[in-house]
From Swiss-Prot:
It comes from the Eukaryota. The gene is ALS2. This is Agglutinin-like protein 2. It is a lipid-anchor; GPI-anchor. Changing T412A: In allele ALS2-2. Residues 548-577, 618-630, 723-746, 783-814 have a biased composition (Low complexity). A lipid is attached at D851 (GPI-anchor amidated aspartate). Cell surface adhesion protein which mediates both yeast-to-host tissue adherence and yeast aggregation. Plays an important role in the pathogenesis of C.albicans infections. Changing N687D: In allele ALS2-2. Glycans are attached at N253, N315, N541, N625, N788, N810.
Length: 874
């Protein structure tokens, strides 16, 4: 039971022990005491006495707690003790063990443990004196080479540390008085292993060495050379106490035995000096050695200067020189510092005293990270000679960002760290967004751009969109108002703008097209001529009306009543005749479209109403002398229209026979020159009297054309392109007369055109320009008949054997052909919309004429006079 209690107490004590720091709190003094026959006060010369202050507070330190004093560049403790107690008033409060660095570590240490005498009510303090010597180099080991840089001759600062607590003092070290250019011999006792290290540096050659030899042999004394611990190298220089500060390799030969060693070398570069060091076992105080000193500097001869030296020691507190072999071993530990310890040794039993060097395993640290809160450490161990790995896993936090708006003018960012979780919060406060005004405008470039102008917080941002201009489509419309308007419709960007122009629509722009009323009137004589000047429309309207008569008789039309026409753009003639029931009316509107049908150019329009019995009305297109040929789709530049009708003698309407004469009130024709061609009777035919009586029965045929002339002729184009021909529709002046057939117009040759009047037949002949041939077609509509449309002749009453028939003109000598019916053949070719041909039959008993714009003019006044005159004659 008691044993269990003791074990439990021990476990509790071990479990509660901790490492404390700051016990050594002052460096009170550092003084040198001459311990041997030394000529100067060097740091490596014993003994330097360090007086340190310490304190233990029972409130923070507990029995079993440990603390350590590290003393860099201290070679060893100059004492025969292994430990020292920290006492106050004779009471021990801690025990400190000595661990000399010697040639194993660059520092020595004092490791202490708090005694059980320290309680929480006690605070102990005092001083401790430590006899030491400093390491300023000596051999070619890494420890000595590092220590060779610890101090320099003169004032130096010596610093020890107890954990984080550093204590320091300044001290003056003297430089060696030995010549640095000659050979140098140093020996040093290593108490822990009871060996002496001997260092030999060759004399200096400034330009380098050609060859050399160095070594020693034991002359007297019990000295054994350890050939397994020999180091050879060249050093770049020496410190203030003639110890090598570096070690580089060189080519050499070594000869070693327990009583002697020899090193030969060659070709050492300038600035370097050869050296070697070796361990020896020494017993007794009388040791004499003979040194070999041969060298040949570059450019010099071989020098041989051997010498003898006797080694003397210093007084150590406890040399422990009992003649036993001391073995030093090294063991790696996971501690962070290197320590030296002596294993238990019983001189009566054990023959070997072992000093164990506890050296930390070399480690490499790898730092990793993970999402978490705490830092973790893990160590991957390794055998001696290899490197262990320490893995440090450092936590990091992820973040989540929360953005909010606020009334400030700047953006703020605040990170809120979560101590218990791996997710932190980043709060971003941004100023409230400004309102935005977007403006779209047009510019002259062909591409679109967007510019954003950002105002300061609290202002208004602007977005300016620049678009290329839209294409524009302009449309002109006619409307009934008397004024013009322009309407612009702007489409959105990328669309098409529209410009609509509305202009006044004049009735003169329309085609004059109508029918004529038909009346039965008594025989009368008279002439009516109607001439009007209008704006030029862009099409041609020709109306030809011919009706069968109820009775017929020969009439004689005097040559003075022949109707004339001019070659300008206005038709100026109209003639009436009597003695018949046939009525012929022609309304023709011309348009010269070379420069476009412009309303500013006046045009002529004629409406003719004719009462005749045996008259032929012929419209022929040709030049002024009747000899030219028309081309398909063209007009003769000097062409004219000749219309010859027989009309009754009616009371004069006082319409001027010469349009454009002064005082007449009628505008002159547009053409600058006027050439008048008179149509004469065909030779051999009787003169047609200028008087007659007829009943007017109306039937009309309307033909509309589109003019594309090349001159100011005013002559209509061919109304049907399918009926065009290259032959002018004119008759020969010397044509033969065929008394046995009806008379027609032969268009096969050029020449003037005369009126042909068959003896007792009423005919109406229309020559349509541009036919396929010059032959005259029968009036009877048969298959393949008048569809080609050269000339249509209708025999309404009687035959060729009736009294008074006159032979017609036939230029080819071939019969023309007759019809023996009471019908009227109406010739009308269907064309396109721009060449439309329509036929209409109207029997409205109304007498009307048309003006140039196509409007019906009611002639109520003169119609009353006309009817009165007719009733008198009837």
């Amino acid at each position: 039971m008691l044993l269990q209690f003791l074990l439990l107490s021990l476990c509790v004590s071990v479990a509660t022990a901790k490492v404390i720091t700051g016990v050594f709190n002052s460096f009170d003094s550092l003084t040198w005491t001459r311990a041997g026959n030394y000529a100067y006060k060097g740091p490596n010369r014993p003994t330097w006495n360090a007086v340190l202050g310490w304190s233990l507070d029972g409130t923070s330190a507990n029995p079993g707690d440990t603390f350590t004093l590290n003393m860099p560049c201290v070679f060893k403790f100059i004492t025969d003790q292994t430990s020292v107690d920290l006492t106050a008033e004779g009471v021990k409060y801690a025990t400190c063990q000595f661990y000399s660095g010697e040639e194993f570590t660059t520092f020595s240490s004092l490791k202490c443990t708090v005694s059980n005498t320290l309680t929480s009510s006690i605070k102990a303090l005092g001083t401790v004196t430590l006899p030491i010597s400093f390491n300023v180099g000596g051999t070619g080991s890494s420890v000595d080479l590092e220590s060779s840089q610890c101090f320099k001759a003169g004032t130096n600062t010596v610093t020890f540390n107890d954990g984080d607590k550093k204590i320091s003092i300044d001290v003056d070290f003297e430089k060696t008085n030995e010549d640095a250019s000659g050979y140098f011999i140093a020996s040093r006792l290593i108490p822990s292993i009871n060996k002496v290290s001997i260092t030999y540096v060759a004399p200096q050659c400034a330009n380098g060495y050609t060859s050399g030899a160095m070594g020693f042999i034991v002359l007297t004394g019990d000295t054994t050379i350890d050939c397994s611990n020999v180091h050879v190298g060249i050093t770049k220089g020496l410190n203030d106490w003639n110890f090598p500060v570096s070690s580089d390799s060189l080519s050499y030969n070594k000869t070693c035995s327990s009583t002697g060693i020899s090193i030969t070398y060659e070709n050492v570069p300038a600035g370097y000096r050869p050296f070697f060091d070796v361990y020896t076992s020494v017993s007794g105080q009388n040791r004499q050695l003979r040194y070999t000193n041969d060298y040949a500097c570059v450019g010099s001869s071989l020098q041989s200067k051997p010498f003898n030296l006797r080694l003397r020691g210093y007084n150590n507190s406890e040399a422990n020189s009992n003649g036993f072999v001391i073995v030093a071993t090294t063991r790696t530990v996971t501690d962070s510092t290197t320590a030296v310890t002596t294993l238990p040794f019983n001189p009566s039993v054990d023959k070997t005293k072992t000093i164990e060097i506890l050296q930390p395993i070399p480690t490499t640290t790898i730092t990793t990270s993970y999402v978490g809160v705490t830092t973790s450490y893990s160590t991957k161990t390794a055998p001696i000679g290899e490197t262990a790995t320490v893995i440090v896993d450092v936590p990091y936090h992820t973040t989540t960002t929360v953005t909010s708006e606020w009334t400030g003018t700047i953006t703020t960012t605040t990170t809120r760290t979560n101590p218990t979780d791996s997710i932190d919060t980043v709060v971003v406060q941004v100023p409230s967004p400004n309102p935005t005004v977007t403006t779209t405008e047009y510019w002259s470039q062909s591409y679109a751009t967007t510019t954003t102008v950002t105002a300061p917080p609290g202002g208004t941002d602007s977005v300016i969109i620049r678009e290329p201009p839209n294409p524009t489509v302009t449309t002109t419309e006619y409307w009934s108002q008397s004024y013009a308007t322009t309407l612009t419709i702007t489409a959105p960007p990328g669309g098409t703008n529209s410009v609509i122009i509305r202009v006044h629509s004049s009735t003169n722009d329309e085609s004059s097209e109508s029918t004529f009323s038909t009346l039965s009137v008594p025989s009368f004589s008279g002439s009516i001529s109607v001439v009007s000047i209008i704006s030029r429309p862009h099409y041609v309207n020709s109306t030809v009306t011919h009706l069968p008569s109820s009775s017929s008789k020969p009439v004689d039309i005097p040559s003075s009543d022949a109707v004339t026409s001019t070659n300008d753009n206005s038709l100026t003639s109209l003639t009436g005749s009597e003695n018949g029931k046939t009525s012929v009316a022609i309304s023709t509107t011309f348009c010269d479209d070379e420069n476009g049908c412009q309303t500013s150019i006046p045009q002529g329009s004629v409406v003719r109403t004719t009462a005749t019995t045996t008259a032929t009305t012929t419209t022929i297109i040709g030049d002024n002398n009747g000899s030219g040929k028309s081309k398909s789709g063209e007009l003769s530049p000097t062409g004219s229209v000749t219309t010859n009708t027989a009309t009754p003698n009616v009371p004069s309407t006082k319409v001027p026979s010469n349009p454009g004469a002064p005082g007449t009130g009628v505008p002159p024709p547009l053409a600058p020159s006027t050439e008048t061609q008179t149509t004469n009777n065909v030779p051999g035919s009787p003169n047609i009297p200028a008087t007659g009586t007829t009943d007017i029965i109306r039937e009309s045929t309307t033909v509309s054309h589109t003019v594309t002339g090349n001159g100011n002729t005013g002559v209509p184009m061919n109304p049907n392109p399918a009926l065009t021909t290259g032959t002018s529709l004119t008759g020969a002046t010397n044509s033969a007369t065929n008394p046995s057939h009806e008379t027609g117009v032969n268009t096969g040759s050029g020449g003037s055109t005369n009126i042909v009047t068959p003896p007792s037949s009423a005919t109406a002949t229309v020559v349509i320009p541009g036919t396929d041939n010059g032959a005259t077609t029968k009036g009877q509509d048969t298959a393949g008949g008048n569809s080609n449309g050269s000339t249509a002749t209708t025999n309404t009453q009687g035959g060729n054997n009736e009294p008074g028939n006159q032979p017609g003109t036939n230029t080819t000598g071939e019969p023309v052909g007759t019809t023996g019916t009471q019908s009227v053949e109406l010739i009308s070719q269907q064309t396109t919309l721009s060449q439309q041909t329509t036929s209409s039959l109207i029997s409205t008993p109304l007498a009307s004429t048309f003006d140039g714009s196509g409007s019906i003019v009611q002639h109520s006044g003169w119609l009353y006079v006309l009817l009165t005159a007719i009733s008198i004659f009837f």
